[in-house]
Amino acid sequence: MPEYVNWLRHASPYINAHRDCTFVVMLPGDGVEHPNFGNIVHDLVLLHSLGVRLVLVHGSRPQIEVRLEARGLTPTYHEGMRITDAATLECVIDAVGHLRIAIEARLSMDMASSPMQGSRLRVTSGNFVTARPIGVLEGVDYHHTGEVRRVDRKGINRLLDERSIVLLSPLGYSPTGEIFNLACEDVATRAAIDLGADKLLLFGADLGLIDENGRLVRELRPQQVPAHLQRLGSSNYQAELLDAAAEACRGGVGRSHIVSYAEDGALLTELFTRDGGGTLVAQEQFELVREAAIEDVGGLLDLISPLEEQGILVRRSREVLEREIEQFSVVEREGMIIACAALYQIADSDAGELACLAVNPEYRHGARGDVLLERIQTRARAQGLKTLFVLTTRTAHWFRERGFVPSSVDRLPSARASLYNYQRNSKIFEKAL
């Protein structure tokens, strides 16, 4: 089977889920200048064609720096924010205006020689952002640097209903006609919150949030963000993106994502695959450990059948699983059962058997087996069981490392010993609870 067929089948639930959803996408000025910008535009057009309501927010920092240098002006910052005097504001307006027009032109192109050839869409920009001055902080006058006061929710939603892509620039206007230089991260975050967006997507140079060991952090909850901000420091752009992502979630946005503008296809990978390719920040749990329900039988069969074929697990038919479903605990991720374990109380004894412990091969890098083991042990104690047995042919060392000790058929309660399969010759371990 062609690989794209399998990919499309796996992506189809996400295509349906994203249709008619509102996504706010923030692309910094560095991302617009990057060679991958053309691919990002193609991907945005694809999202639009799939029914996603798109608000695109662009930055302009490097473009402003170029204009300041051309005029012999020195950029001035305080606490990471640009101080925008009158001369700097002229550079800001020039940079933002040119960039907005360039982005509109790119989105207006016929996507010749691309999957989106023939796509026609409308891009709309305007005075959707009302701003106010930051003013004087710690004795420093920020002049024309401002912050978002409100976003024209009704006006933007009306355009989204009409199938326009709304383009927001990092400029805001006051009711008295003043112009303020804004941070694109602030514009995107406030737009996502005020619009009640389903997602805020933030582009950065890296794949996402990188931890102290150089590894990608794939998932975070807002409560975990402060520790990373402290590690990164206030001058780190990753910290700015992470702070914006967490603020959006606290403001009611369903999910925030940090992805790379340098990685071709990063946006689509993040949105249409189960594990994504960037960093996800969300209030809800990404994985749920729970007791199994009858609706999980199909997912359990998908999980354990390959292990049964290899002789690692004892075969269980659909009928058996349906009958014994209440014995199972599962780990669910994005609607997919990725791990399971079962607890059987052994008749006429105070012992139980841990059985059918299985983890999807793609998710064995985590501690999901340990999580399920703890879950089963907690259930066993709640049932008043004193001993937990396990029979295994392949994972003896794993259980020994977790406190199980070698046992024998003679140690099994008679109700279980009479069912022991000598041909399978499983090793027996037990653990006092």
Curated annotation (Swiss-Prot):
Pathway: Amino-acid biosynthesis; L-arginine biosynthesis; N(2)-acetyl-L-ornithine from L-glutamate: step 1/4
Residues in N-acetyltransferase domain copies: 287-426
GO molecular function: L-glutamate N-acetyltransferase activity
GO cellular component, as recorded: cytoplasm
Family per record: Belongs to the acetyltransferase family. ArgA subfamily.
Pfam families recorded: AA_kinase, Acetyltransf_7
Subcellular location: Cytoplasm
Domain of life: Bacteria
Keyword DNA repair among record annotations: no
Reactions that this protein is recorded to catalyse: L-glutamate + acetyl-CoA = N-acetyl-L-glutamate + CoA + H(+)
Organism: Pseudomonas fluorescens (strain SBW25)
GO BP term (any one): L-arginine biosynthetic process
Name of the protein in its database record: Amino-acid acetyltransferase
Listed InterPro entries: AceGlu_kinase-like_sf, Acyl_CoA_acyltransferase, Asp/Glu/Uridylate_kinase, GNAT_dom, NAGS_kin, NH2A_AcTrfase
Residue ranges crossing the lipid bilayer per the database entry: none
Location (main, coarse): cytoplasm
Enzyme Commission identifier(s): 2.3.1.1
Alphabetical UniProt keywords: Acyltransferase, Amino-acid biosynthesis, Arginine biosynthesis, Cytoplasm, Transferase
